[in-house]
Amino acid sequence: AGQSEIRTGLESVKAQPGRLQVRAGARGACLIDDTYNANPASLKAAIRALANRPGRTVLVLGDMAELGPRAEDFHAAAGRQARDAGIDHLLTCGMLAGLTAEAFGKNACHFDSSQALIDSACQLLSPGLTVLVKGSRSAQMEVVADALICVSHDGAIAC
């Protein structure tokens, strides 16, 4: 295959839903939907991908499940990784994800419900902002990602 055919083939590849899928966010923001699942290694890769985006960045994180006795350590480490990578804001929801927000420090907020998280995230959305949403399947972070896209299921503006 020639370079032109390879280029055409690569341009036609689409991300699997919930796996670093870039979507148009409300208010001109860019949304990266990585809600399919989460573990420490995939979260580290997602943080790296978000940190490489231009402009301001927000990581929206739900709990990582099934991590065993080191679950708290993994969640706290994720907050430090995001902070050290230069992520601008961290929004979390879930019992363990609160430890992530605590370790991130300034510009992190933890919420008791996904709706409260959505309401806060909507206030941050603006052109040039990239938001990455991630969490284990049990955290149901796809609900958050869907709420932050341009158009809701009924056709209304989401935020």
Please report, for each region that a protein language model flagged, where it lies by residue.
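ATP-dependent carboxylate-amine ligase
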Residues: A1-C159
